[in-house]
Amino acid sequence: MIHKLTSEERKTRLEGLPHWTAVPGRDAIQRRLRFADFNEAFGFMTRVAIKAQEMNHHPEWFNVYNRVDVTLSTHDADGLTERDIELARFIDGAATHAQPGA
């Protein structure tokens, strides 16, 4: 069974994910990304969708034109787990075309 990260584990793991912030009122993290246009945003989402399917761990996300909002949390654990951290790292790597300060 997947275990929810402890406070110390969470702090340590999130140090390497500076673009991610805590979601108020939830044990989850979020990131907003902006791309040059819809095609770049959709291409990014496609890369993440393939990885998420391989992991059997799917993000909550929302897309409008060039913006993608991503929230990660593991429902089975009712909070943040290593799966979320792994997917967040992949998302950061896949976001090479995201605009700075998004």
From Swiss-Prot:
It comes from the Bacteria. Keywords: Lyase. Its EC number is 4.2.1.96. InterPro entries: PCD_sf, Pterin_deHydtase. One of its GO terms (biological process) is tetrahydrobiopterin biosynthetic process. Coiled coil: none annotated. GO terms for molecular function: 4-alpha-hydroxytetrahydrobiopterin dehydratase activity. It holds the Pfam family Pterin_4a. It catalyses: (4aS,6R)-4a-hydroxy-L-erythro-5,6,7,8-tetrahydrobiopterin = (6R)-L-erythro-6,7-dihydrobiopterin + H2O. The keyword Manganese does not apply. Belongs to the pterin-4-alpha-carbinolamine dehydratase family. NCBIfam families: PRK00823.1-2 (NF002017), PRK00823.1-3 (NF002018), PRK00823.1-5 (NF002020). This is Putative pterin-4-alpha-carbinolamine dehydratase. It comes from Burkholderia cenocepacia (strain ATCC BAA-245 / DSM 16553 / LMG 16656 / NCTC 13227 / J2315 / CF5610).
